[in-house]
Amino acid sequence: MSDLTKRALEQSLKNLLLQKPLHKITISDIADDCGINRMTFYYHFKDIYDLVEWSCQEDAAKALAGKKTYETWQQGFEQIFEAVLANKPFIMNVYHSVSREQVETYLYKLTYDLLEGVVEEQAAGMSVRPEDKAFIANVYKYAFVGLMLDWIKHDMKGDPREIIDRLDRVIHGSVAAALDRFRVDKPASNPGV
C-alpha cells in the first residue's frame, strides 16, 4: 500500500507540473489532487523535493535495470535519455523552477550508477585502486551529464541515439585503456597525450 500511495503522489505532482511551475505547487495541492490528507503526504515524504528525488530515483532504477555492463552501456544511456524525455514536463519544470543543480544531481547519480558497473566489469583481473576506478567513472559521468544537460538546455531537441553513437566513437575502448594506465600491478608507461 505504501508504494501505491507514493506512486499516486508522484503522479499527482507530475499532473500538477503540467499546469504550473514546481515552486508554486504546495503539498496541499498534491494531497488534494491525490485525494489524501496532508499528513499522509508527510508520512511518506518530508517535502516536495523529497518526492521529486524519490521520483527520479524510481525512474533511474527502471531505466538502468540490467544495463550496467560494457556491452550494454549504450542501451543504459539511451534508457536514461528516454526516461528524461518521457518525463519532459517534470524535468524541464525542475530544471527551470528549482535549479539546474537538482537536475545535475539526479543525472550524476543515474550515470554514475551506470558507469560504476562498466568500470568494475572492465577492471576484472586488473589490480586498480578503488579510488582510481571511482575517478575514471567520475570522468565519464561528467562527460555524459554534460552532453545530457546540453540536450535538456536545448529543449531535448536532437536524437539521443545519434548523441550516444557519437560519444561511443569518442570513448570506445578508453575505459579499459584508462584502467590499464592505473594498474598497480605493472609499471607505469608513458601515457602521452
What feature does the model see in each segment?
Residues 25-26, 92-94, 103, 160:
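Short, hydrophobic secondary-structure boundary micro-motifs
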Residues 40, 90:
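Residues in the helix-turn-helix
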Residues 74-89, 138, 146, 161:
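Amphipathic alpha-helical segments that line or abut small-molecule/effector binding pockets
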Residues 100-125, 131-146, 176:
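Amphipathic alpha-helical packing segments from all-alpha helical-bundle domains
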